[in-house]
Amino acid sequence: MTTQLTDAKAGVITEAMRRVAESEGQGADLIRDETAAGRLVIPANKVHLNDNLQPAGIGRVLRTKVNANIGTSSVRCSVQAEIEKMEAALAVGADAIMDLSTGGDLDAIRVELLAHCPVPFGTVPIYQVIEGRQVEDVTRDIILRTIEKQAKQGVDFFTIHAGVLREHLPLVEKRVMGIVSRGGALLAKWMLHYDQQNPLYEMFDEICDLMAEYDVCFSLGDGLRPGAIADATDEAQIAELRTLGELTQRAQERGCQVMVEGPGHVPFHQIQYNMEIQQKICHGAPFYVLGPLVTDIAPGYDHITSAIGGCAAAFYGASFLCYVTPREHLGLPNTDDVRAGVVAAKIAAHAADLARGLKGAATRDRELSVARSNLDWKTHLATSLDPQTADRMHREACQEIGATELHSADYCSMCGQHWCSARINREVREALGGRRTVTSSSSPAR
């Protein structure tokens, strides 16, 4: 039985590693070495990999990845609606999908989504463990059987809340929001009812062995993540993080790939510290953050508060951003919310990659800028992060100025013909040195 991690440690470059290297423009040796060191993961369940999965890597030497959460609830449950959300997320560049369904036939929903999902696919198994029963009725056997079943179905990464310990619970009493993680809250209730330790922690080695069999990647859940700015970087959060550092090593020693989940709600000035301490405590394992949201006061706009924090997080150490939609804290997102959330997170991820000088990150920006300078609308729109939205807005502008040929207009409705700086600049260039079109090699990229 081998995994991407054990193969990498043995010096083997797997086909998945080669495909990641090719898609990222990196050397396969680098992918193997970073995987072996535990600083890069390739969530690729053997079942999904043999079906329709396009392997993707998550780590600091690669571009920052973005995950989109979808899933049913007891209030709204439609498999087709979730497929449409997933397709919308993928259309604007989501690198991974998580199914957080809590309503309906969870197995049927998961299998159907997996059949349509070409990117890494994650779940939170404890949700299915709890669904349809009281928390007090959960047994260790139910937990293990659920994890094994989902692994057999092809899930690529599991959020496992094994770091929430019985002794951590008193630390959340003085919090404003307490425990905001659904998995963390459910496990806390179980521990208090039985006055026992977290069963995921106690059975961790058994869980590792089940996951290693199918090469399911750990996403060690932060059940005590702060859900309010007032709770950020508190004693409970750091205590759990130290446990996650211990579990990271234990899982890797048993051949499992590991990434670690992080906050949450964090004021901007604490983000750098949060990223750096995670890297230190968790031995460089990829950090997967929900946001973080940098303020609590923007319901309806939390895709923006999240993008601000996500950009800083990715610059200072995170490798994987979980999107937040405009409907966060307000309700289950619809397809439009999903699109908005992914786009905001993609902007944050790309801006961070630019700032940290990632190889090739500036290429697309320069291509678009050259097209913009040359009033090449076709390339301008096609190169944008969300061509569909950019094209719609440009069409509306062309209608406003009466342009019949969308891609030949030499101005837009923002400045009008006589005030268009791009058009005027072209005239200036012509006057200075003859007719010259700016190209991608006209001047060095910075």
Task: Label each residue range with its predicted role.
Residues R18-R19, N45, V324, S421-N425:
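Short hydrophobic alpha-helical segments that form membrane-spanning helices or hydrophobic packing faces
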Residues P170-Y194, P226-A232, R250, H269, ...:
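Catalytic or ion-coupling anion/metal-binding cores of large enzyme and transporter domains
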Residues I297-S306, C311-L358:
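C-terminal catalytic subdomain
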Residues T3-T295, Y301, A307-F320, G402:
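Alpha/beta enzyme core
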